[in-house]
Regions:
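Helix-start (N-cap) detector for alpha-helical repeat units in TPR-like alpha-solenoids
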Residues: 1, 34-35, 67-68, 101-102
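Canonical positions in the second alpha-helix
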Residues: 25-26, 59-60, 92-93
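Register position in tetratricopeptide repeats
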Residues: 12-13, 46, 79, 109-116
Length: 119
């Protein structure tokens, strides 16, 4: 059985709990490991469980440096009110693709918040 593909099917039907279980099996088998870690993290993000998503995103980044991995890590930190770590990850994502408008917007929002807080 291709756990990764079946997990994607569950993800696409918004059954995130079942998707997580199958992505974890895929990770154990080292099948599409970086993508499986990332997709598991995204399921946790969809479930608003940011604390569980963070270590998965960090592990996926050890395997593959990808803009969306850094961006979602930044998003998790924003949702947990850790603007400093969020900014670091958004800036890292932006260095990988300076044309990314979402990264630029996220960075601007955080920097503007810092400016307002320091007035």
């Amino acid at each position: 059985m291709n756990y990764f593909q079946k997990a994607n099917d569950y993800y696409n039907s918004k059954d995130y709990h079942k998707a997580i279980a199958l992505y974890k099996k895929s990770i154990t088998l080292k099948t599409n490991e970086a993508a499986s870690l990332y997709n598991t993290a995204v399921c946790f993000i969809k479930l608003k469980n940011y604390k569980d998503a963070i270590p998965l995103l960090e592990k996926s980044l050890l395997l593959k440096k990808d803009i969306k991995y850094f961006f979602n890590l930044g998003y998790c930190y924003i949702m947990l009110d850790n603007n400093k770590k969020a900014l670091i990850n958004f800036k890292t994502a932006w260095t990988l693709n300076p044309e990314d408008k979402d990264c630029k917007k996220a960075i601007s929002l955080i920097e503007n918040k810092y400016k307002k807080d320091n007035l």
